[in-house]
């Protein structure tokens, strides 16, 4: 069984570790999680995970090393682990805006590097994860894809689209959550109690997403089914569009993509 070291015990790192075990991809004993403050990993230790505050030691027997840290912190961590790395270890980076070339510049050109961009729905096994690489072979790509498929869906993309994937999938989950919040606030405006309005908005959003996933249909074809001539749905949609709904959404995604591309150098 492959051994995995996850450097960074934050939300993404811990969710990945727990998701892999829950999906029976591997045992907790096969995973080591590192964090500077070990007291925050007490629960994981009790659940059978290996924990450490020493990154070089933690990666010594790992087959896969996941860099689950902020882009602003990754250079320091790479400098720390570079002397310990072996050529047969695979590096998986989930840091936004840090290219395979950036990583190899520090860790060595002989290293196998694969980038992955999950989102916070990884905590419930529903992440949308995009994967890319520069030169990793198909076997490695398939293995990393299998790893992340245990915690959601996976799409393999070209590396030059990874900052775009960050905006659409990682930042995107916040955009959709803000839309749900706005819908619930609208529900309160028209007479519902806040908790009822939120429940209704959440389930409606879930139903809309499941319709597209299960029917394989396009959003507009499903919209057409609920818009009748002179009806209330088309009136509401047109009011939103007149106030820039789609335009604001698109502009937000584009700006997030631009920002994501510069995080490593900020």
Model-inferred region functions:
Residues 1-53, 57, 126, 188-190:
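NAD(P)+-binding Rossmann beta1-loop-alpha1 motif at the extreme N-terminus of oxidoreductases
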Residues 4, 162-167, 219-224:
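Short pre-catalytic strand/loop immediately N-terminal to key active-site residues, enriched for Gly-Thr
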Residues 16, 38, 47, 55-60, ...:
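Rossmann-like NAD(P)(H) cofactor-binding subdomain of soluble oxidoreductases
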Residues 31, 58, 74, 193-201, ...:
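Small-residue helix-packing motif on alpha-helices
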Residues 102, 106-112, 128-164, 175-216, ...:
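Internal alpha-helical scaffold of NAD(P)-dependent oxidoreductase catalytic cores
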Residues 117-122, 167-176:
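Glycine/serine-rich anion-binding loops at beta->alpha junctions
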Residues 202-266:
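NAD(P)-dependent Rossmann-like dehydrogenase/reductase catalytic/cofactor-binding core
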